[in-house]
Amino acid sequence: MAVIKTKIVLDADVIILFAKGGLLSLLPRIFPEYEYIVLDIVYKEVKQPILNQLNNQIKFFQNIREVTFGDTIEQKREFARLTDVMGLGRGESACMVFCRYNHDVIGSSNLRDIVAYCEKHEIVYLTTIDFLFYGIQRKVITKDQANEFITIVNSMGSRVPQVDFDTYICSKI
């Protein structure tokens, strides 16, 4: 009998940041007890050259899986409400709805758009900093690598906060 793992549903922002920072291949090693997925809607948001890195994870390493979003009418309605009525992005909306109805974890750094919905529906979410924190705790990366990652992605125009990983606390998982 196959073990069904809880999924970490990656939003485009986390994929893009980890690809820019050179750590996309290590991301699935941070929580190996979870299955990492990218929804087809999110996959379509990822552009080259990052798409090449994502495809390598999906096709060659097989540690991230692409999944089609919207199995039920209920999910499709909620997605339409979030995108059309609330004006949220398609990727974030798909991830939140998927996690709500499947009891999975969202990986997103778009806190402005996800926090209220996730808290209302008791959806666990992990940010880029949370992944880095747990990566350090689980000895997948070092503090120096995490800090270098932040410096690199910020030099490319991203806005990842500098944190002190010795005092940072994350108790989401």
Question: Language-model features: where?
Answer:
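PIN/NYN-family metal-dependent endoribonuclease catalytic core
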Residues: K5-L10, K20-G22, L26-D71, I129-F133
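Short active-site loop/helix that positions an aromatic residue
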Residues: F18-L26, V115-H121
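Acidic, metal-associated active-site segment
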Residues: G89-V105, D113, Y134, F149
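Acidic catalytic patch
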Residues: I64-V85
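Acidic, PIN/NYN-like endoribonuclease modules and their adjacent C-terminal/linker elements
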Residues: I114-I173
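Histidine- and aromatic-rich ligand-binding microenvironments
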Residues: D11, V38-D40, L88-G89, G107-L111, ...
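Alpha-helix capping/helix-boundary segments
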Residues: V14, V42, C95, D113-I114
